[in-house]
Regions:
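Short acidic, hydrophobic short linear motifs in intrinsically disordered regions
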Residues: 16-39, 117-142, 244-249, 322-354
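Internal, well-ordered domain-core segments that constitute the primary functional module
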Residues: 108-186
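Eukaryotic partner-binding/assembly regions in large regulatory complexes
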Residues: 1-90, 169-179, 193-292
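Positively charged, polyanion-binding regions of nucleic-acid-associated proteins
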Residues: 6, 11, 16-20, 24, ...
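Short amphipathic alpha-helical interaction segments
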Residues: 43-51, 144-161, 352-366
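C-terminal functional regions that serve as terminal interaction/effector modules
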Residues: 317-322, 330-402
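A short, conserved structural fragment
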Residues: 56-60, 156-171, 274-278, 364, ...
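C-terminal engagement modules used by replication, chromatin/transcription, nuclear envelope/ESCRT
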Residues: 166, 170-215, 369-402
């Protein structure tokens, strides 16, 4: 009997972990796109809700056909932008939204949120409504321009990725990009998913600046509430960020982190998520052995991921030598040397200054997102986690396009 109970408990633990991992990857998840995972979410709804709240301070809402993990915007963070869905590219390589994308997204969500009766409407009608609302807030929108139509449709595709907006069978939003009003199509709005996606601690129409989005969650103004806020902040950073450095923490956070890191904090995160802790004196990182619970796969295949990886030994060597701050000319020189060394495998021309500038910028952008370097006025400051990649192994079998 005890053996059977152990097996059942192990199965329950694995199912809970799979469900939480699914929600962390895709916080709006439903029956339509992931029936088996949604079944697990429904099965363990109460336990999942407690675990998400106790560990991370997140709230879980489970509806008839979808679940929503609410992750409060507790800081301004530009490292995880919305991005344009692409059918043939992995999500971490989708093109980030521009400010214009966000304008259209704000207008569309505001319109659909205010008009709960809108279930179906032509794309051109939605475009007209967006233009009128744009005028009201002082934004000039011209859908006679193909570039504007393209941005608008890319926002609709992002909403389609979350299954909030669906295009009728046999029609395409891309026709509107190419043909304007002659390329109309019928949109179906899932009002339930829309309400879950757009839910915030205040209505969108009341948000006037980025700071209005900040909402750390509900923590009582007591000693216990303060401790819960510190605990949730640290757990979120450890789960969401590539690495957490001790020097980046407040005094209160640092004291809790150093006291709890070897035991409770690490164990709770590992058991709940399946992530594995890597600790150094300077900080901690939680990595996924399956390489699925991540915003950005690194290392990974492809020139744009291999070159930053091969730059890490140079960065680690400079850091060890006490030269943590590197200028852009130094970095371009290191990139140029790598391009020359791998000329047979990569098509980027090391003799073209514009190419070197572009490749260097892309590499530093990725390394910054991974918290391996941080930007300073003169260039970058190398951070300790770069030592993790000081001896990379890269295999290239053919010449790769850049």
């Amino acid at each position: 009997m005890s053996e059977l109970l152990n097996e059942l408990e192990l199965e329950r633990t694995e199912e809970l972990r799979a469900a939480l991992r699914a929600l962390l990857r895709r916080p709006l998840l439903g029956q339509a796109e992931a029936p088996e995972l949604f079944r697990l979410i429904r099965k363990h709804e109460d336990a999942l809700r407690r675990r998400a709240n106790e560990l991370l301070g997140y709230q879980l809402a489970v509806r008839a056909d979808h679940a929503r993990l609410f992750r409060p915007a507790w800081r301004l963070d530009a490292s995880r932008p919305a991005a344009v869905p692409h059918k043939t590219e992995p999500q971490d390589r989708w093109r980030p939204f521009t400010s214009r994308h966000y304008l259209f997204l704000y207008l569309v969500l505001s319109l659909l949120e205010e008009r709960h009766s809108l279930v179906q409407l032509p794309l051109t009608e939605l475009a007209d409504l967006v233009c009128r609302l744009g005028v009201e807030i002082g934004a000039t929108i011209d859908f006679d321009q193909r570039s504007e139509r393209k941005l608008f449709v890319e926002v609709l595709k992002w909403l389609g990725h979350w299954r909030v907006v669906r295009v009728s069978e046999g029609e395409s939003q891309d026709d509107y990009v190419d043909r304007g009003r002659d390329g109309d199509c019928l949109l179906t709005v899932d009002q339930g998913r829309l309400a879950s996606l757009a839910s915030a601690h205040r209505p969108l129409t009341e948000i006037s600046c980025a700071a209005d989005l900040i909402h750390e969650g509900e923590h009582a103004p007591t000693d216990e509430g303060r401790r819960a806020r510190v605990r949730h902040t640290l757990a979120r950073r450890l789960v969401e960020d590539p690495v957490v450095y001790v020097d980046d923490l407040s005094e209160e956070e640092r004291a809790y982190f150093l006291a709890q890191r070897p035991t409770n904090l690490t164990r709770s995160i590992e058991e709940a998520t399946g992530l594995r802790a890597e600790h150094r004196v300077e900080g901690s990182a939680f990595v996924d052995p399956d390489r699925k619970l991540t915003d950005t796969r690194f290392p990974d295949r492809g020139f744009e991921r291999q070159l930053p990886l091969l730059l890490c030994p140079y960065l680690a060597t400079e850091l060890e030598a006490g030269r943590a701050e590197l200028t852009l000319p130094q970095l371009r020189g290191a990139v140029r040397a790598l391009l020359e060394r791998h000329r047979a495998q990569w098509s980027a021309d090391p003799d073209d200054p514009d190419t070197v500038d572009h490749v260097t910028g892309d590499a530093l952008s990725l390394l910054t997102r991974m918290r391996l370097v941080e930007t300073i006025p003169a260039g970058v400051r190398v951070l300790p986690a770069v030592h993790r990649y000081r001896d990379p192994s890269v295999r290239t079998t053919r010449k790769e396009e850049t």
